């Protein structure tokens, strides 16, 4: 980014009374990984599992082939743990300074929260929420990774579901509404 563009951005942020950041695959790319929809990663996954990620990462596959789903989930989404990038840390600093009011993100790795942001809307959920479909108990990534086969709830023994929106799932309407409210309040959107 040129010095002129940086100066314009700085002025826009300083003059803003309500700033919202919209984050997605760009932040993920900055962390050194590609999303499942990137052409190179999708091809590598299809070569490895014999099925495209567009089918592997669906509610139908999770329900019909939970063992295979969790092999894919643990290998492709939980290993290695993706670390927050400079963007996530910079957004947290802006929030602490009072120049950023909200982060709306489509990534599922809690990058903004783990970078230090407090007011974050995770549109597609997060891999850090793995809940029992029966009692609702939340399970850590470490627990999911430690399970040899299909992870079952430590409390009641029922199946665990990742707290993410799979391909084809509807995004929670309450999160959409909350995001719209935040964007309406904003006089500056950072993309």
Give a label for each model feature.
Residues 1-191:
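Conserved catalytic core of sirtuin-type NAD+-dependent deacylases
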